[in-house]
Amino acid sequence: MVKPSLEFALNEPNRYYDRHFERSAVKILPGEYFATRENTMIVTVLGSCVAVCLYDPVLKIGGMNHFLLPNDNVTAPNMMTESARYGVFAMELLINHVLKLGARRNALEAKVFGGGNVLRGLTVQNIGERNAEFVLDYLQMEQIPVIAADLLDIYPRKVYFFPETGLVKVRKIKTIHNSTIMDRESEYRLRIKNLPSGGDVELFGE
């Protein structure tokens, strides 16, 4: 008998034990996602990127992604642009894998974070705002209610998501001692800049 999957991730999960919260955790980086049906905390650090914490509050299944839209020189996101199609692909990956773990499509709830104006030297004005606008528009289009949001501002955020309860804790990082956050997002942005769109990903049913 095949055991049901307990989690899905884009890459090998970066696992660690969080001493403060006294629990197992997975840290995701720009371009990654993680979905689980276990009591695993999901953690990420956001600058201009956005993260969606998606979960089924009854079945206690959830996941988080971390992405931004590639630069296609469009001021506002539009679902037909190449960059928006990349965002759609990032969202559909997360939704599909939460559903594969057993979550119900019509029970999903979302909490969204990030979109800060923290990157320097970008040709697109306020990329964080574009990312935030895209993710809110997408969730509205998919009829997934946004239960909580902490978007925009000028500070990076560290996000802690507890999928079994839907609880999210956010810490604004107002003092930055190095350029790690900006370097990771800049490298990720350059990596996806010339990628073809993700293509069509069929969503599972209710």
Curated annotation (Swiss-Prot):
NCBIfam families linked: PRK13487.1
This protein's name: Probable chemoreceptor glutamine deamidase CheD 1
KW DNA repair (keyword) present: no
UniProt catalytic activity: L-glutaminyl-[protein] + H2O = L-glutamyl-[protein] + NH4(+)
Lineage: Bacteria, Pseudomonadati, Pseudomonadota, Gammaproteobacteria, Alteromonadales
GO biological process, one term: chemotaxis
InterPro entries, sorted: CheD-like_sf (IPR038592), Chemorcpt_Glu_NH3ase_CheD (IPR005659), Cytotoxic_necrot_fac-like_cat (IPR011324)
Superkingdom, natural source: Bacteria
